[in-house]
């Protein structure tokens, strides 16, 4: 993957904590130990696909960014592309947001959509959506790292 290659070139570390044979709390404890060792300002959950406990979310409040593969608030939770395909939507999108205790409901940092139509298969729709996810996540991370996001009353203000 080109992301892995760029990551190595930039000396960005990553870690893998398998979750099989661990309770959710045990898994999060291992992840928290790794996070705390690095003390990051921002934590990106890309393809994490696990619901976090409230304790974990509270511990890293304001630092967790998630990319969700739908144009929120539509199609919260798992399998949004399947849901979108079944509903016959005319646009699909992605949303980068801060993580809160409520699933996929945190303050929105960035969003984008692309048009789709009846000729798209479910697989084509998902592939097109993944491309949107990449660009939305990159934009959101850039905005956060450039300190251009202000959160107020559960909403974000993006400074240009």
Model-derived segments and spans:
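Single conserved hydrophobic/aromatic residue that forms the stacking wall/gate
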Residues: 1-8, 12
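Alpha-helix C-terminal capping/helix-to-coil transition sites in glycosyltransferase folds
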Residues: 7, 37-39, 59
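Adenosine-nucleotide cofactor-binding segment
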Residues: 13-40
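Donor/substrate-binding cores of folate-linked one-carbon enzymes
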Residues: 23, 27, 42-160
């Amino acid at each position: 993957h080109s992301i892995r290659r760029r990551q190595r070139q930039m000396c960005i570390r990553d870690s893998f904590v398998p979750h099989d044979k661990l309770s959710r709390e045990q898994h999060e404890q291992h992840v928290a130990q790794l996070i705390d060792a690095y003390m990051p300002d921002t934590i990106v959950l890309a393809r994490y696909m696990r619901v976090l406990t409230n304790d974990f979310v509270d511990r890293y409040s304001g630092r967790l960014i998630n990319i969700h593969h739908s144009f929120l608030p539509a199609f919260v939770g798992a399998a949004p592309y399947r849901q979108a395909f079944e509903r016959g939507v005319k646009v699909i999108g992605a949303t980068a947001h801060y993580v809160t205790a409520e699933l996929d409901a945190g303050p929105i940092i960035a969003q984008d959509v692309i048009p789709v139509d009846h000729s798209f298969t479910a697989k084509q729709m998902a592939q097109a959506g993944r491309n949107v996810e990449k660009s939305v996540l990159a934009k959101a991370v850039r905005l956060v790292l450039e300190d251009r996001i202000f959160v107020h009353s559960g909403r974000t203000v993006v400074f240009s």
